[in-house]
Amino acid sequence: VIIKALAFGLSLLLAGCAGASGQEPVKVTAGRFLSALASGDHGSACALLAPRARESWAPADCEGGIAGANVPDGVPETVSVWSEEAQVKTARDTLFLHESPTGWLITGAGCRHRNEQVYDCVVGGP
């Protein structure tokens, strides 16, 4: 019983450490997306969108669509990760991400919460 308790405690400790390091790739992706938008590099911003977020526009018009989406600028402040899903908050925006086999992708940006569980996003959604 003691060994099981120690093993469980060690696994919790390791999970806590992994959680903090697991936030960095999410924060980097969100930062790259926001920087691309701020600099007008809509092609790079579109490349960071998950397919379901790009579905907001015709396949050939992601760049035009995202240029007119008015996603608030900002820098990532808080990051929450739940397995393959993540949320990043800036001072004026909430972004949602999904971990794909190639890395983290933006699934929603320009999101404002309507209530505790529902978000409206100008790009994609949660």
Where do the language-model regions lie?
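Short solvent-exposed beta->alpha transition segments
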Residues: 20-85
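Short intrinsically disordered, low-complexity segments
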Residues: 9-11, 90
